[in-house]
UniProtKB/Swiss-Prot annotation:
Classification via CDD domains: IMPCH
Pfam families recorded: AICARFT_IMPCHas, MGS
Protein name: Bifunctional purine biosynthesis protein PurH
Gene Ontology MF annotations: IMP cyclohydrolase activity; phosphoribosylaminoimidazolecarboxamide formyltransferase activity
EC number: 2.1.2.3, 3.5.4.10
Pathway(s) of this molecule: Purine metabolism; IMP biosynthesis via de novo pathway; 5-formamido-1-(5-phospho-D-ribosyl)imidazole-4-carboxamide from 5-amino-1-(5-phospho-D-ribosyl)imidazole-4-carboxamide (10-formyl THF route): step 1/1; Purine metabolism; IMP biosynthesis via de novo pathway; IMP from 5-formamido-1-(5-phospho-D-ribosyl)imidazole-4-carboxamide: step 1/1
Taxonomic source organism: Erwinia tasmaniensis (strain DSM 17950 / CFBP 7177 / CIP 109463 / NCPPB 4357 / Et1/99)
Family of this protein: Belongs to the PurH family.
Organism taxonomic ancestry: Bacteria, Pseudomonadati, Pseudomonadota, Gammaproteobacteria, Enterobacterales
Keywords per UniProt: Hydrolase, Multifunctional enzyme, Purine biosynthesis, Transferase
Amino acid sequence: MQQHRPVRRALLSVSDKAGILEFAQALSQRGVELLSTGGTARLLADAGLPVTEVSDYTGFPEMMDGRVKTLHPKVHGGILGRRGQDDAIMTEHGISPIDMVVVNLYPFAQTVSRADCSLEDAVENIDIGGPTMVRSAAKNHKDVAIVVKSSDYQAIIAELDANECSLTLATRFDLAIKAFEHTAAYDSMIANYFGSMVPAYHGETTEPAGRFPRTLNLNFIKKQDMRYGENSHQQAAFYIEEHVGEASVATAQQVQGKALSYNNIADTDAALECVKEFDQPACVIVKHANPCGVATGSAIIEAYERAYQTDPTSAFGGIIAFNRELDEATARAIISRQFVEVIIAPSASDAALKITAAKQNVRVLTCGQWQQRQTGLDFKRVNGGLLVQDRDLGMVSDSQLRVVSKRQPSEQELRDALFCWKVAKFVKSNAIVYARDNMTIGIGAGQMSRVYSAKIAAIKAADEGLEVTGSSMASDAFFPFRDGIDAAAAVGITCVIQPGGSIRDDEVIAAADEHGIAMIFTGMRHFRH
């Protein structure tokens, strides 16, 4: 089998035109004949490149508003023809070999993500000719190179220069893998979208209804292999979505430190998603996926100092997230005070990075600033299945709160209640959070009994000498009994925020009134398992 195949003719037809002009220029300069279609052909011609329209090459015009462009034997014969085996039949029918196909597909995902997308819009953004060419070229990778990612353009030109304008079989095989991954992901998106449209077309059916598709097809790209998973006997890797428009641990850039571990990534995600809830400069410290200290301040150094006070013991070896740039003063405070696994922030100043560089094992990530949190899906694997739900982006506004106690909360109590309510959303259930002056003073996480979470929060505050009297308390779900309120009153809590909805709400409210506690119902639960 010939390892190298020369590239003499290339067909270029792309929706995402980033880098295509420079790539086409590089190919043309190396003597490669260019075929192209539609907007891509116009772009190349306008730049003065010698390019042949596919319709001129086939002798058959584009038609049906561009629906039929490349579906022609001269195109697919040129791609699928096996060199040395199909040469005679290709010559007989005037089919020239096509050595490289450069294609990316109609922007279906971007189209259906628009709020105003109609079914007709979605249908017109289903690419037919593109995937057909991609699959044809990938199938015949022994002879043809298929390029679906602009990130490969530079490396391909470098290899052409190193190998007298030819590509190795290994490269063509790698490109074919990417091509099949590309079309599989594309078809999955279309199947998911159409599967979600079943109720609109059929009304009552025996199929499971709702907005989720009947068959869920997921496509993630491997970002890195890991030394091990949650435990050392488990193998692991990190996969990310191809199109992530929101600042996240998946899109973050690591600017310092050793490779992220499985647990690092999980904990960093928890910290970053929590700190996104706050508008003021904020710091979240996480250990084992639970916040152990959260605070806001006039600047992030103040936020860090206050968050650290909540639980210095648990902060050791933790993850620290900020919603502002990591500055020199904050970096110095962290490095001089504690062992930290990961620091993540929208950005980091050069001065801050000089400080963290003194501890080379500290992982520093920058994720960019976020504007708005995007809707999406959360997944939980169970044995033999997958639970799917919307991301929990719910958060109550002041107007949605309902005071159910006799006593109204003060302005300070209300601010603290809303603060700890945001934190409770990110604490494992059963979750109890004590807060005062926009700073957590005690967090009780993951207990099977809600009252024990309340007791743990009180113990945490007492251990650090933090004053509880006059503080607010948040509970991620309703209190099934009054004992949680009694426990809160015993340590000086004066305001409680919770969803409400228990059959014993009257007893719980009565307990609050007995203790002179202001109680607020949100009407929204935030279980986290």
